[in-house]
Curated annotation (Swiss-Prot):
Keywords: Cytoplasm, Endonuclease, Hydrolase, Metal-binding, Nuclease, tRNA processing, Zinc. Pfam families: Rpr2. It catalyses: Endonucleolytic cleavage of RNA, removing 5'-extranucleotides from tRNA precursor. GO terms for molecular function: ribonuclease P activity; zinc ion binding. Zn(2+) binds at C59, C62, C85, C88. GO terms for cellular component: cytoplasm; ribonuclease P complex. Binds 1 zinc ion per subunit. Its EC number is 3.1.26.5. This is Ribonuclease P protein component 4. The gene is rnp4. Part of ribonuclease P, a protein complex that generates mature tRNA molecules by cleaving their 5'-ends. It is found in: Cytoplasm. One of its GO terms (biological process) is tRNA 5'-leader removal. Its cofactor is Zn(2+).
Amino acid sequence: MKVKNVKPYKRRSLELIEMAIDMTKNREYQLAREYTKLAITYSRKFRFKIPIEYKRSICRKCYVPLVIGLTERRRIKNKVVIRTCLLCGWVRRYELKRDSKEGKGIPPRHKNRQERTQ
């Protein structure tokens, strides 16, 4: 089934995720879990991507929004961010971004490298 207008579903999905984050802050984890499952179902059914900042804020095992201090623990070790869900124990690791000026596609032996990276 091809849906012509996906925008209302995408907007509703993002609203559901934001409501789920609010429910998590109020410690209503079951309701927050239902909201995030519904938002993910919308994105799969109507074929749109959930933005990465929302996608990374949801536990992939128990579908609870990750809020630092309530449902998530963050640690940084060796330039890697380690995120742990405090409800189910799910662990995810993300590399920290490198310095954006250094690797802009300029070879190390280029004659103007110093000028371009400053």
